[in-house]
């Protein structure tokens, strides 16, 4: 009986090791795969947004009419919408999609405010420039964490 019990324990140990080894080799992912092109796109759009705010800050406040920046607003909006679409179609990518949606919503709010007031003050520009930097850093880090 002890021989049978020892044999059973040996088989149990072997099967446990095989099972454990197979589990170590398996990875269940609940996040999208890393995409270097998405990270580069985030950085490219971040640069455009930073340049946009830099240009506004370099322009005297009396010359910051919305019509002079309308095309830039539309180009950046289109880039953010394209990034949102790219993130949305990737499986397990809700966080990145939500972050992109936040950036797009902030951008649209800024555009509407500029359109309504037909100017933007320096303090608001500096604040919003920093906000976007934080959002884009979070987006890029989030994509990088998928590696």
Predicted regions and their residues:
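C-terminal amphipathic alpha-helix
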Residues: 106-147
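Short, solvent-exposed segments of well-ordered alpha helices
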Residues: 28-40, 63-70, 119, 123-126
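Bacterial N-terminal signal peptides that target proteins for export
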Residues: 1-17
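Short, charged, amphipathic alpha-helical segments
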Residues: 66-74, 94-101, 122-130
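Post-signal peptide N-terminal segment of mature Sec-exported envelope proteins
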Residues: 33-57
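C-terminal motif of bacterial Sec signal peptides marking the signal peptidase cleavage site
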Residues: 21-25
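Alpha-helical segments in soluble extracytoplasmic regions
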Residues: 54-93
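Heptad-repeat alpha-helical coiled-coil/4-helix-bundle sensor or tether segments in soluble regions
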Residues: 87-115
